[in-house]
C-alpha cells in the first residue's frame, strides 16, 4: 500500500472519489478519535456515539462524490455528523452524555512535562462545565473553534449559519462559560474540605472573557 500519510485530507478525498479505499482508511484514522469525542458530547451512551461515528463515515464514503475541496474535509465530515445527531435526537431525545475521552489538549500552555496529567484532567473538567452550562449549539461552536480549530467560516458552514451569527454565539458562549467558571471558583473558595478543581482557573477565565491563554 502506498504511503498516504503525507497527503492532505483534500488530496485523499480526491483519491476516494476515484475509488481508493486505502485513502478513505487514512481519513478515518485521522478523524475517528476527534469525531468520536465530538459525538460523545451529544449521544446518550458511548455505544450511541460509536454508532453515530460509524454511520458518519459510512455516509461520507457513500457521498464522497458530493465533496468539494473548496471546504475542508473536516468541515464536510462534521456537517454529516451533526445532521445525523439531529436525527438521533428526534428519535431518542437527549439524556446523559457518555464520558469525554481525555486526550491530549490542542491548546495547552505547559511549564514542565510533570504538569501534563493534571492539566489534561483539568482540560476535560473544563469541557464538562461547558457542556453543563451551554446550550447545544453554543457548545458546538466553542468545541469546533477550540477543539477542532475550525475557522469561523467553516463553523458557519457546519451550522448553516452566517459568520456574523457564529461570532456572536462564540462571544456569548465564552462569556457564559467565564461566569460559570467564576462561580465554581467562588464555591470552592468557601470550602476547605475539597481540593480546587481548576488550579489554572485564572487562565481559563481569561480565555472565556476573550483572552488567549487557555487550555481549550
Predicted regions: what is each one?
Residues 2-3, 17-26, 36-55, 163, ...:
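Short, charged helix-capping/linker segments at alpha-helix termini
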Residues 6, 88-110, 117, 186-190:
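Short, basic/polar amphipathic helix motif occurring as a linker/hinge flanking DNA-binding modules
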Amino acid at each position: 500500500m502506498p504511503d498516504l500519510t503525507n497527503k492532505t485530507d483534500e488530496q485523499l478525498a480526491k483519491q476516494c472519489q476515484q475509488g481508493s479505499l486505502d485513502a478513505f482508511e487514512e481519513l478515518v484514522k485521522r478523524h475517528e478519535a476527534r469525531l468520536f469525542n465530538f459525538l460523545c458530547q451529544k449521544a446518550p451512551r458511548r455505544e450511541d456515539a460509536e454508532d453515530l461515528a460509524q454511520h458518519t463515515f459510512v455516509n461520507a464514503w457513500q457521498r464522497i462524490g458530493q465533496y468539494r475541496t473548496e471546504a475542508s474535509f473536516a468541515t464536510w465530515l462534521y456537517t454529516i455528523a451533526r445532521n445525523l445527531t439531529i436525527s438521533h435526537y428526534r428519535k431518542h431525545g437527549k439524556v446523559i452524555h457518555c464520558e469525554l475521552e481525555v486526550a491530549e489538549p490542542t491548546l495547552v500552555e505547559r511549564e514542565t512535562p510533570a504538569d501534563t496529567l493534571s492539566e489534561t484532567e483539568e482540560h476535560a473538567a473544563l469541557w464538562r462545565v461547558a457542556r453543563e452550562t451551554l446550550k447545544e449549539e453554543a457548545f458546538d461552536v466553542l468545541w469546533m473553534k477550540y477543539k477542532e480549530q475550525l475557522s469561523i467560516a467553516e463553523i458557519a458552514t457546519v451550522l448553516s449559519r452566517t459568520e456574523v451569527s457564529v461570532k456572536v454565539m462564540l462571544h456569548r458562549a465564552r462569556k457564559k462559560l467565564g461566569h460559570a467558571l467564576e462561580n465554581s471558583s467562588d464555591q470552592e473558595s468557601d470550602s476547605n474540605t475539597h481540593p480546587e478543581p481548576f488550579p489554572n482557573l485564572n487562565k481559563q477565565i481569561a480565555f472565556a472573557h476573550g483572552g488567549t491563554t487557555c487550555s481549550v
